């Protein structure tokens, strides 16, 4: 495994995404929690 640029971005809906930049920008959403009740 090579070292890759990793970044975590949080959008307005409080969804956390792991952004992996490997050639083409690739965004993997690993948290999608609807928190309407909170």
Curated annotation (Swiss-Prot):
Gene Ontology MF terms: serine-type endopeptidase inhibitor activity
Gene3D superfamilies: 2.80.10.50
Domain of life: Eukaryota
UniProt keyword annotations, A-Z: Disulfide bond, Protease inhibitor, Serine protease inhibitor
Keyword Disulfide bond in record: yes
Keyword Disulfide bond recorded: yes
Family: Belongs to the protease inhibitor I3 (leguminous Kunitz-type inhibitor) family.
Purpose of the protein: Inhibition of trypsin.
Assembly information from the UniProt record: Heterodimer of an alpha and a beta chain linked by a disulfide bond.
Name recorded for this polypeptide: Trypsin inhibitor DE5 beta chain
């Amino acid at each position: 495994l090579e070292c890759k640029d990793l970044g975590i971005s949080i959008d307005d809906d409080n969804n956390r995404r792991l952004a992996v930049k490997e050639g083409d920008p690739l965004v993997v959403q690993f948290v999608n929690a609807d928190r309407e009740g909170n």
